[in-house]
């Protein structure tokens, strides 16, 4: 039996989803730590002796059962449910658009309600079904400040960070839509693993730089990996960064998930152009942080992502430099055929050259899979994500970026 189960007929039927709470001032319980959830309940009058029990109940209903309506919590008293409805929400974001690629990749454009005096924002989340696993690509920011020259998201101005709730809500909504919670069914025609979890892996590789939103990402990933809730193994969660060196150290110490580096060049002069954060954290500093990442072994390697750009970084000299750069680091090198997007000046390397590059690296003892492009037809592939939320004024954006730089010790 194939590890991929294709449901028929193939015509997509949107399944009912919970309606978002529009302009709701009520805080969400999603994304709160147990301690924060307990404090929120106490503030609304829950007796001290009941708080721990109530938190356990809510945790199970939200993250194990996947409910988005307090009335579905069958073992919670009616009075308690009424209090929860009056003061809190566990609603999902609004699905603005759902697209399904010919290869089964699924992309959601999600809208989150305003924060404070802000406006609603939109982000993209992508589900990639493969044999034996299903990977969810999650966004951490609305837009991005890093302006990597080959990345479509980099052309979208940074609007704001996502909260821990908004990061986790992408995972909860995907599991809703894919029938990955009890008593849920996926739309007919959905391609997904035939056995086990529909969302087995989570990668912080969507819109934004996760390590410029460290605290929210940390909270979300620790909740996602909590053994009494969503229970994703930390070895099945990968955080991808362009190289925010100070926070790479913190990621290893405080989160402990798998690490991926958006590398793309082996010389500082070229990487300065492709990945401008390299001007602040050059390759030597980045490699030092990688070598210090806790728990590295042949079974726990850092993934280095390398987009193949024709005539830019795809020579055998580049391959030789890559081998030298990664010496002593347990590594896997993902070679990514460049995914075109409207307005780009880059081209994908010829397939023959990509294979030569991969063979050269493989001969040196490094795993060097060529990533199969997924979801290109719906702009869901690596480097293609972008939403229409570009509403932060220039002065606000520059102030926000200056704050982030100050918080990371930049000049």
Swiss-Prot record:
Miscellaneous information on this protein: Reaction proceeds by a ping-pong mechanism involving intermediate methylation of a conserved cysteine residue.
Gene name linked to the record: rlmN
GO MF, one annotated term: tRNA binding
GO cellular component: cytoplasm
Annotated residues for binding of S-adenosyl-L-methionine: 208-209, 240, 262-264, 339
Name of the featured protein: Dual-specificity RNA methyltransferase RlmN
Enzyme class, first EC level, given as a word: transferase
Cellular location(s): Cytoplasm
């Amino acid at each position: 039996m194939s590890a991929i189960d294709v449901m028929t007929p193939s015509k997509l039927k949107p399944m009912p989803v919970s309606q978002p709470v529009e302009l709701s001032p009520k805080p969400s319980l999603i994304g709160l730590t147990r301690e924060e959830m307990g404090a929120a309940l106490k503030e609304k009058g829950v007796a001290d002796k009941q708080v721990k029990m109530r938190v356990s109940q809510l945790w199970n209903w939200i993250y194990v059962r996947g409910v988005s309506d307090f009335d579905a919590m069958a073992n919670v008293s009616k009075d308690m449910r009424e209090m929860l409805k009056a003061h809190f929400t566990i609603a999902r974001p609004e699905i603005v658009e759902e697209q399904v690629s010919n290869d089964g990749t699924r992309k959601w454009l999600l809208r989150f309600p305003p924060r404070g005096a802000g406006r609603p924002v939109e982000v993209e989340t992508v589900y990639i079904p493969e044999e034996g696993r299903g990977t969810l690509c999650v966004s951490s920011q609305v837009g991005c400040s890093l302006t990597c020259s080959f990345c479509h998201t980099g052309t979208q101005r940074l609007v704001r960070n996502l909260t821990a709730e908004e990061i986790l809500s992408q995972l909860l909504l995907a599991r809703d839509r894919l029938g990955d919670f009890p008593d849920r069914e996926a739309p007919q025609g959905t391609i997904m693993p035939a056995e086990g979890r529909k969302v087995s892996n989570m990668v912080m590789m969507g819109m934004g730089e996760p390590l410029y939103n460290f605290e929210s990402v940390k909270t979300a990933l620790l909740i996602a990996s909590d053994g009494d809730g969503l229970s994703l193994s930390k070895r099945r969660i990968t955080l991808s960064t362009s190289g925010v060196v100070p926070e790479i150290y913190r990621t290893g110490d405080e989160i402990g998930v798998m690490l991926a580096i958006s590398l793309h060049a082996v010389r500082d002069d070229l990487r300065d152009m492709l990945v401008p954060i390299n001007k602040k954290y050059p390759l030597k500093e980045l490699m030092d942080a990688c070598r210090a990442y806790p728990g590295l072994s042949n079974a726990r390697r850092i993934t280095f992502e390398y987009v193949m750009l024709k005539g830019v970084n795809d020579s055998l000299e580049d391959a030789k430099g890559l081998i030298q750069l990664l010496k002593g680091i347990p590594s896997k090198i993902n070679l990514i055929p460049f995914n075109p997007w409207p307005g780009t000046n880059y081209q994908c390397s010829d397939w023959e050259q990509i294979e030569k590059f991969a063979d050269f690296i493989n001969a040196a003892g490094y795993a060097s899979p060529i990533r199969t492009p997924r979801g290109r037809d719906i702009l869901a592939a690596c480097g293609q994500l972008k939403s229409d939320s570009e509403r932060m004024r220039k002065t606000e954006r520059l102030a926000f970026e200056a704050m982030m730089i100050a918080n990371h010790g930049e000049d």
